[in-house]
Amino acid sequence: MNVRRLPIPTAVVAAAAALGLGALSACSSGGAAAGDTDKFDVVASFYPMAFLAEQIGGEHVHVTSLTQPGQEPHDLELSTQQIVRLQESDAALHLKGLQPSVDEAIAQSEVGTKIDAATLTSLEDHEDEHGHEDGHEDEHGHEHEHEGGKDPHVWLDPVKYAEVAEGVGKAFEKADPDHAADYRKNTEALVGKLHDLDAAFETGLKNRKTDVFITTHSAFGYLAERYGLIEEAISGLSPESEPSGARVKELTRTAEADGVTTVFYETLVSDRTAKTLADDAGLKTDVLDPIEGITDGSRGDDYFQVMESNLKSLQTALGAK
């Protein structure tokens, strides 16, 4: 669509040349040039943002995700080609605090429309297993901190995700007014589906035997808060942080005291820690997907299908009738 096309900074051009990238019209995963289409070109940071852009934009948008399927988004480092792609886009959609390299690239870019999903709903502090705000080292000694200690995983709460969707829809309407009516209609339809999903979780998790569930990664704080559950995470908000031996023993006692049957792991991170804890405590394992990306191993083809699978897994684990 090329709503606003600005010159690419000299530093980016030089870096691209140094890497032998040639022409600067970077191709998206779909094969079309991000800055060279007749549509509203949106670069999204990772799957939950790309899904919103696609659902709201419909036929009027061309969406490129910076995080590829199967790639762990927390540790994403952008290539020069991706930075060029971002620079040539009409809009950038991200969730500040989740991917530092993306936040920095968007802040430094001259993209006409910058949409930070973290400003479209309220973010909260969800403490880690030691009672501290997030800030963990993984097994490689890398520190992972989220913006202001806030938990960014808002898309796992359908109500908060709907709030973000409404904000994205308004931003699209403002940036591409020729298609505002369609963006508004698509946003309303998406928000309606998210409210239906919320109702399904509310109903489906009633009459449960326990409120407690154990996960490898503290991604489900908003979901737990929404439906009155208690998430006990083996690790903190960083999916790669390693738990202490004391934490593993504490979770074993918690599982026995609260009637926990299952240790949940996720699709993009190793299940080794979950299975070790489950074996020690005599528990089962199952998938609870934080939907940071869709892969061939996902239990569904899109956000709604995977969330429905998550609901079924929780119902089984919590003994919901």
Report residues per predicted region.
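Extracytoplasmic metal-acquisition and chelation regions
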Residues: N2-K321
